[in-house]
Protein backbone atom coordinates (compact mmCIF):
# COMPACT_ATOMS: atom_id res chain seq x y z
CA UNK A 1 0.00 0.00 0.00
CA UNK A 2 1.29 3.44 -0.95
CA UNK A 3 0.05 6.54 0.85
CA UNK A 4 -1.11 9.22 -1.58
CA UNK A 5 -3.31 11.29 0.77
CA UNK A 6 -1.74 14.76 0.95
CA UNK A 7 -2.62 15.28 4.62
CA UNK A 8 -1.01 11.97 5.60
CA UNK A 9 2.08 12.76 3.54
CA UNK A 10 2.34 16.17 5.25
CA UNK A 11 2.24 14.43 8.65
CA UNK A 12 4.94 12.01 7.51
CA UNK A 13 7.12 14.92 6.38
CA UNK A 14 6.63 16.70 9.70
CA UNK A 15 7.57 13.54 11.58
CA UNK A 16 10.67 13.02 9.43
CA UNK A 17 11.73 16.62 10.10
CA UNK A 18 11.21 16.06 13.84
CA UNK A 19 13.37 12.92 13.78
CA UNK A 20 16.07 14.78 11.84
CA UNK A 21 15.97 17.63 14.37
CA UNK A 22 16.86 15.08 17.06
CA UNK A 23 19.94 14.05 15.07
CA UNK A 24 18.60 10.71 13.87
CA UNK A 25 18.10 9.24 10.42
CA UNK A 26 14.89 7.99 8.84
CA UNK A 27 14.40 4.85 6.76
CA UNK A 28 11.14 5.12 4.81
CA UNK A 29 9.96 1.61 3.96
CA UNK A 30 7.38 0.70 1.31
CA UNK A 31 6.22 -2.86 0.58
CA UNK A 32 3.62 -2.57 -2.21
CA UNK A 33 3.12 -6.35 -2.30
CA UNK A 34 2.92 -6.48 -6.11
CA UNK A 35 5.26 -6.94 -9.06
CA UNK A 36 6.41 -3.61 -10.50
CA UNK A 37 8.43 -2.78 -13.59
CA UNK A 38 11.57 -0.66 -13.53
CA UNK A 39 9.82 2.60 -14.35
CA UNK A 40 7.21 2.05 -11.64
CA UNK A 41 9.87 1.33 -9.00
CA UNK A 42 11.88 4.42 -9.94
CA UNK A 43 8.71 6.52 -9.97
CA UNK A 44 7.79 5.23 -6.52
CA UNK A 45 11.26 6.01 -5.18
CA UNK A 46 11.13 9.55 -6.57
CA UNK A 47 7.66 9.97 -5.04
CA UNK A 48 8.94 8.79 -1.63
CA UNK A 49 12.12 10.89 -1.92
CA UNK A 50 10.02 14.07 -1.72
CA UNK A 51 9.42 13.25 1.97
CA UNK A 52 13.20 13.66 2.53
CA UNK A 53 14.08 10.39 4.27
CA UNK A 54 17.72 9.38 4.61
CA UNK A 55 17.13 5.92 3.17
CA UNK A 56 14.31 4.58 1.01
CA UNK A 57 13.50 0.88 1.27
CA UNK A 58 11.27 -0.69 -1.37
CA UNK A 59 10.24 -4.34 -1.55
CA UNK A 60 8.25 -5.56 -4.54
CA UNK A 61 7.07 -9.05 -5.49
CA UNK A 62 8.97 -11.37 -7.85
CA UNK A 63 6.75 -14.25 -8.88
CA UNK A 64 8.99 -15.40 -11.75
CA UNK A 65 12.37 -14.87 -13.41
CA UNK A 66 11.09 -11.93 -15.47
CA UNK A 67 10.13 -10.10 -12.26
CA UNK A 68 13.56 -10.88 -10.81
CA UNK A 69 15.37 -9.54 -13.89
CA UNK A 70 13.18 -6.43 -13.76
CA UNK A 71 14.31 -5.90 -10.15
CA UNK A 72 17.95 -5.92 -11.29
CA UNK A 73 17.17 -3.37 -14.00
CA UNK A 74 15.29 -1.24 -11.47
CA UNK A 75 18.23 -1.26 -9.03
CA UNK A 76 20.58 0.00 -11.74
CA UNK A 77 18.15 2.79 -12.62
CA UNK A 78 17.51 3.68 -8.96
CA UNK A 79 21.23 4.26 -8.50
CA UNK A 80 21.22 6.62 -11.51
CA UNK A 81 17.93 8.47 -10.91
CA UNK A 82 17.43 8.76 -7.14
CA UNK A 83 19.67 10.94 -4.97
CA UNK A 84 18.59 9.38 -1.66
CA UNK A 85 20.16 6.06 -0.62
CA UNK A 86 17.93 3.16 -1.70
CA UNK A 87 17.64 -0.40 -0.48
CA UNK A 88 15.55 -2.35 -2.97
CA UNK A 89 14.85 -6.04 -3.31
CA UNK A 90 12.08 -8.37 -4.34
CA UNK A 91 10.34 -10.90 -2.15
CA UNK A 92 8.38 -13.93 -3.28
CA UNK A 93 9.30 -17.24 -4.87
CA UNK A 94 11.74 -15.69 -7.38
CA UNK A 95 13.01 -12.75 -5.35
CA UNK A 96 15.72 -14.29 -3.18
CA UNK A 97 18.65 -13.55 -5.48
CA UNK A 98 17.78 -9.84 -5.51
CA UNK A 99 18.74 -9.70 -1.82
CA UNK A 100 22.37 -10.28 -2.85
CA UNK A 101 22.57 -8.95 -6.42
CA UNK A 102 20.83 -5.61 -5.84
CA UNK A 103 23.29 -4.46 -3.14
CA UNK A 104 26.12 -5.37 -5.51
CA UNK A 105 24.41 -3.24 -8.18
CA UNK A 106 24.32 -0.25 -5.83
CA UNK A 107 21.70 -0.91 -3.18
CA UNK A 108 22.44 0.81 0.11
CA UNK A 109 22.14 -2.15 2.47
CA UNK A 110 21.37 -5.83 2.86
CA UNK A 111 18.78 -7.02 5.35
CA UNK A 112 20.11 -10.11 7.12
CA UNK A 113 19.68 -12.10 10.29
CA UNK A 114 22.49 -12.56 12.79
CA UNK A 115 21.37 -16.14 13.36
CA UNK A 116 18.22 -18.04 12.58
CA UNK A 117 15.68 -18.72 15.28
CA UNK A 118 11.99 -19.52 15.47
CA UNK A 119 10.94 -15.96 14.55
CA UNK A 120 13.44 -15.41 11.72
CA UNK A 121 12.45 -14.34 8.24
CA UNK A 122 13.77 -17.30 6.28
CA UNK A 123 14.03 -15.25 3.07
CA UNK A 124 16.86 -13.27 4.67
CA UNK A 125 20.39 -14.63 4.49
CA UNK A 126 22.46 -14.91 7.60
CA UNK A 127 24.92 -12.04 7.98
CA UNK A 128 28.09 -14.12 7.63
CA UNK A 129 26.95 -15.73 4.36
CA UNK A 130 25.74 -12.45 2.88
CA UNK A 131 29.02 -10.70 3.71
CA UNK A 132 31.10 -13.49 2.19
CA UNK A 133 29.07 -13.56 -1.03
CA UNK A 134 29.08 -9.78 -1.52
CA UNK A 135 32.76 -9.36 -0.67
CA UNK A 136 33.73 -12.08 -3.15
CA UNK A 137 31.45 -10.74 -5.89
CA UNK A 138 32.96 -7.26 -5.53
CA UNK A 139 36.42 -8.76 -6.12
CA UNK A 140 35.46 -9.83 -9.63
CA UNK A 141 33.45 -6.75 -10.60
Regions found by a protein language model. Name each.
Residues 1-12, 25-36, 54-65, 89:
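Catalytic beta/alpha-barrel core
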Residues 18-28, 49-55, 79-83, 103-111:
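Glycine-enriched alpha-helix->loop->beta-strand junction motifs that scaffold or abut catalytic
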Residues 6-20, 36-40, 63-78, 96-97:
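Active-site-adjacent beta->alpha loops and helix N-cap segments on the catalytic face
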Residues 12, 41-42, 126-130:
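Well-ordered, non-membrane alpha-helical segments in soluble/globular domains
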